[in-house]
Design a protein with these regions (language model features):
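Long, hydrophobic alpha-helical segments
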Residues: 1-13
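Membrane-spanning alpha-helical segments of multipass transporters and channels
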Residues: 59, 69-190
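Selective transmembrane-helix segments that form parts of the transport pathway or gating/packing helices
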Residues: 34-61, 78, 82, 167, ...
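Transmembrane helix boundary and interhelical loop/hinge segments in multi-pass membrane proteins
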Residues: 11-32, 44, 190
Length: 190
């Protein structure tokens, strides 16, 4: 679930600002009184709604087709997932501020984000069995913290208080990604 959400979110948002630059509408946005923060938030909102629809679809398929039990609270699961969706969207927007073309943005978000997410998030290989350098690198992979939190809530049936650490780390990642995206966006404006 973490891989699908991250890839869909990052790929959707990674082309948003690049498309504005390629079509020439970025110049119109730049002369408007809209601040870069509000521009980034406005880019995220529709993709957040689409990602929530994806989340519901994934959960319904997991429960009713694959018979994955949800032992914990659906609210806790949704809250953790919403935070992860925001982090993934901000990651895609960061890619969008760096990339020059839509193809470059899609390739970067597809390949560069997918490989570390698959290999270092704990989704396939247990983090405890990885060499220490890879364990340290896995700490900056948002999907790692999402997967750990999802296991606690969905499989172990623990409450939201047991996933506070993971939620805090994901929120910190969101703030850092937002600050970096704003700086990159402002640098691009100059």
């Amino acid at each position: 679930m973490g891989l699908i959400l991250m890839l869909i979110c990052a790929m959707m948002t990674s082309i948003s600002i690049v498309r504005e630059k390629e079509t020439g509408t970025m110049e119109v946005l730049l002369v408007s009184p809209v601040r870069p923060l509000w521009m980034i938030i406005a880019k995220m909102v529709p993709y957040f709604v689409l990602s929530c629809v994806n989340l519901v679809t994934i959960l319904l398929l997991s429960v009713y087709v694959l018979h994955v039990p949800v032992a914990g609270s659906l609210f806790s699961l949704a809250l953790l997932s919403w935070i992860f969706i925001v982090v993934s969207l901000l990651l895609g927007l960061l890619v969008s501020t760096i990339a020059r073309t839509q193809v470059e943005a899609m390739l970067f978000s597809g390949m560069v984000l997918m490989m570390p997410t698959v290999l270092l998030s704990g989704m396939i290989f247990p983090i405890e069995n990885m060499p220490l350098p890879l364990q340290l690198i896995s700490n900056v992979i948002p999907a790692r913290w999402y997967i750990v939190g999802i296991k606690k809530i969905m499989i172990e049936g623990l409450g939201i208080s047991y996933a506070q650490r993971e939620m805090g780390i994901l929120m910190l990642m969101a703030v850092v990604l937002l600050i970096i995206s704003l700086k990159k966006f402002n640098k691009r404006l100059e």
